[in-house]
Design a protein with these regions (language model features):
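Loop-rich non-cytosolic ectodomains and luminal regions
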Residues: 1-175
Length: 175
């Protein structure tokens, strides 16, 4: 934004290539039930993280079930707080004016298989939330959502306010 906002400058940036990576999940809850989000993790994965974002004033708790069936119950943790279990949860209100909620979950040496996140909104206006996995190049092995959403997969810096974000496609490979 700083460069693009200068006099007689136009910044054009790439939007990234994550639409087909299966690294974004969009969910919506009616406030009465949890939304199950399945993540497939490959063998011998050293670790990864995911970010769950909900727009203010939504407040969300997350329960996690491992591939072996162990369930860590949902905890609705307000404000800026931190919980450490077998993996790490960080709940934070983010943004100077909006106060959007970020739930940052880091998995260290996770078991291979399907992990299920149960997203449980405690305060619901729209019930909408997004979850992102890291970009493809930042993961050593394949970690994907089983029901991904290919929309809202812009990468930084294309998510800035001022620059023009452009996408491209290799017409030979279709990517």
């Amino acid at each position: 934004d700083d460069i693009a906002g200068r006099w007689r400058r136009c910044a054009v940036v790439a939007t990234g290539n994550e639409a087909n990576a299966r690294h974004h999940f969009y969910g919506k809850s009616d406030g009465n039930s949890m939304v199950a989000v399945e993540v497939n993790v490959e063998q011998r994965m050293r670790g990864f993280y995911l970010e769950l974002w909900a727009s203010a004033p939504e407040l969300i708790g997350v329960a996690v079930r491992s591939p072996g069936g162990t369930l860590m119950p949902a905890q609705n943790v307000p404000g800026n707080s931190h919980q450490e279990q077998e993996f790490i949860f960080d709940y934070a209100q983010v943004g100077r004016t909006r106060g959007d909620q970020l739930v940052f979950i880091r998995f260290e040496n996770p078991a291979a298989g399907i992990w299920t996140l149960y997203v449980n909104p405690s305060t619901t206006i729209t019930g909408q939330f997004h979850i992102w996995l890291p970009m493809s190049g930042m993961l050593e092995k394949d970690v994907v959502f089983l029901r991904p959403d290919p929309d809202v997969t812009l990468t930084v810096p294309s998510s800035a306010k001022i620059p023009i974000g452009v996408g491209g496609m290799d017409q030979k490979s279709g990517i």
